[in-house]
Amino acid sequence: MNTQANITLSDIRMMILCGYPLSIEEYGHCYYDGDGVTRSTEEAYVWYRVAQWAGNHSVDSLVDYIGPTLTTSKCLKLSSRAKHIYTRALRH
């Protein structure tokens, strides 16, 4: 399977503003498990970090679990991408 999940900034914004950071966490689970999308721990890491930015700290252990499997520079790059997604969604 070589698919990417289709989610818009408006969708993310609604999840954040309506207080549904668990939905963003579920999006990360889809990538981590390869459920309907191509499995990617890096993409899962991004969405778990977006969930953290949205206030969902139940993903802290998942971020702590995946983080050490990535290089420091990769973690920084992916974390920066997550912050960018979060801030763009709020401005959208």
Label each residue range with its predicted role.
Residues 1-27, 33:
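Alpha-helical adaptor scaffolds
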Residues 13, 17, 46-49, 83:
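Alpha-solenoid helical repeat scaffolds
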Residues 26, 43-50:
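Short N-proximal segments of mature Sec-exported proteins
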Residues 3, 65-92:
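Terminal, low-structured helical/coil segments at or just beyond the last alpha-helical repeat
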Residues 2-10, 38-46, 76-77:
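Structural signature of tandem alpha-helical TPR/SEL1-like repeats
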Residues 17-21, 33-35, 40, 54-57:
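Short helix-capping/linker turns of helical repeat alpha-solenoids
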Residues 26-33, 62-68:
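Hydrophobic face of amphipathic alpha-helices that form TPR/SEL1-like repeat modules
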Residues 41, 48, 63, 79-82:
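Inward-facing hydrophobic residues that define packing positions of alpha-helical scaffold repeats
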